Regions:
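Long, low-complexity intrinsically disordered regions
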Residues: 1-243
Length: 243
């Protein structure tokens, strides 16, 4: 998706194109087959869900054909993780590739160890305590998490940026999108992002299964794979999107 002369333009393909993804199940199959995929167009040509779908069907509110709705369906199924994983922008990582990304992005650190070594700010800790120890399996609405972590008018600033950074480090993901519920138990408003730890999706042992490897070796594995699948992509483009 690009802004051209003040107008947002979607880049995609026709329904009859053999490379077109037509349904959420086809999207899941493609993501699992490749391993990871940004949601929107980026500097690497063709490397996005946007460029493999019909532009006119985005935001059509039809779950059969709307890729914007697919992202929520995929997040809810907990087979593939969804979040801001690519240059602080949205995308998907398969279960197969998640440990590789986690080892590199976390530099082999669990969050508590990262914080204890002075490599994470206190505002990140205020968020992560809601997903650690007794809270390890929490799924929390974004508005509730913001309040619980002490962000807001008279508290910490930069909640959205902190969440994005924790996703980029693969500590958090969007595990669902749901409407809020009022005191009478009635849903209202727009769908709201729901966050969880990635360990909640795949389990701690699996997520950390590449910690035994050097994080730079995990990065090399990602880069080598991208060069194999997208030989026209430059090191600079790969580094910008995936580092």
């Amino acid at each position: 998706m690009g802004n051209e002369s003040g107008e947002w333009i979607m880049h995609g393909i026709n329904w009859d194109n053999p490379d077109c993804i037509h349904s959420v199940d086809e999207a899941i199959k493609y993501i699992n087959g490749f391993g990871f995929l940004p949601l929107f167009k980026n500097d690497i040509d063709g490397f996005s869900l946007e460029e493999r779908t019909v532009p006119e069907y985005w935001w059509s509110d039809n779950p059969e054909i709307d890729p914007w709705m697919w992202r929520a369906i995929i997040a809810k199924r907990h087979d593939i993780v969804y979040g801001k994983f690519f240059d602080k922008k949205a995308g998907f990582i398969s279960k197969k590739w998640l440990p590789v990304f986690a080892n590199y992005r976390r530099d082999g650190y669990d969050f508590d160890a990262l914080y204890d070594d002075g490599k994470a700010p206190n505002k990140h800790k205020k968020i992560m305590v809601n997903f650690m120890e007794d809270n390890a399996d929490s799924e929390i609405y974004s508005n509730e998490l913001k309040k619980q972590a002490g962000f807001g008018k008279d508290g910490e600033k930069g909640f959205d940026g902190a969440i994005t950074n924790l996703m980029m480090q693969t500590y958090l993901c969007n595990c669902d999108f749901k409407k809020r519920v009022n005191k009478r138990g009635i849903e209202y408003g727009w769908d709201v992002a729901v966050y969880s730890s990635i360990e909640h999706i795949y389990g701690y042992d699996y997520v950390t299964s590449c910690y035994k490897d050097n994080p730079q070796d995990s990065w090399k594995q990602i880069v080598d794979y991208m060069h194999e699948m997208y030989p026209e992509a430059t090191d600079k483009q790969i580094r910008k999107l995936l580092k």
